[in-house]
């Protein structure tokens, strides 16, 4: 029986490249001349720290970062940015977390979405991924389109497509 896995992963090397590109653009931007502003990637806990002298500039830096991530093939929804920025002394910063894996509540939501669609496929949760099996390849492609089209707030990839 054909099957595939639904996962949510971010290529950390591409994130590192995007952060480097954003830092390079930051050096050439006229509106950031003489301003203390940085991007810092923490590989261990998969966060990106965006630091600047004002909250408005932090928003500008986040826009630059999102644009660079998008150019590298990483969707903006994979970046979880808190609403409140932290003010410390003369700097403002925010720790944006990269979404890795699918949380159990989201897994249940996806499984329910697939079951409610009346497609002839079965879905089961396996760790941080969801295995979807069906009798025909067309049903599986319908399930893929359903997950892509459902506004779930997180990017998903499809792996291990087997016939």
From Swiss-Prot:
GO terms for cellular component: cytosol. InterPro entries: DUF520, UPF0234-like_C, UPF0234_N, YajQ-like_sf. The lineage of its organism: Bacteria, Pseudomonadati, Pseudomonadota, Gammaproteobacteria, Enterobacterales. NCBIfam families: PRK05412.1 (NF003819). Keywords: Nucleotide-binding. Belongs to the YajQ family. This is Nucleotide-binding protein Ent638_0893. The keyword Nucleotide-binding applies. Nucleotide-binding protein. SUPFAM superfamilies: YajQ-like (SSF89963). Pfam families: DUF520. GO terms for molecular function: nucleotide binding.
């Amino acid at each position: 029986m054909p099957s595939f896995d639904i996962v949510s992963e971010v290529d950390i090397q591409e994130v590192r490249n995007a952060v480097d590109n954003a830092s390079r653009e930051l050096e050439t931007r006229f509106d950031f001349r003489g301003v203390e502003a940085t991007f810092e990637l923490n590989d261990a806990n998969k966060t990106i720290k965006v630091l600047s002298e004002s909250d408005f500039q932090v928003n500008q830096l986040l826009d630059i970062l999102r644009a660079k991530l998008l150019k590298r093939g990483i969707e903006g929804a994979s970046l979880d940015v808190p609403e409140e920025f932290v003010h410390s002394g003369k700097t403002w910063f925010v720790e944006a977390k990269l979404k890795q894996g699918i949380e159990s509540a989201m897994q249940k939501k996806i499984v329910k979405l697939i079951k409610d669609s009346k497609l002839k496929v079965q879905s089961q949760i396996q760790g941080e991924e969801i295995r979807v099996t069906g009798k025909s390849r067309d049903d599986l492609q319908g399930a893929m389109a359903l997950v892509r089209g459902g506004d779930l707030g997180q990017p998903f990839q499809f792996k291990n497509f087997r016939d």
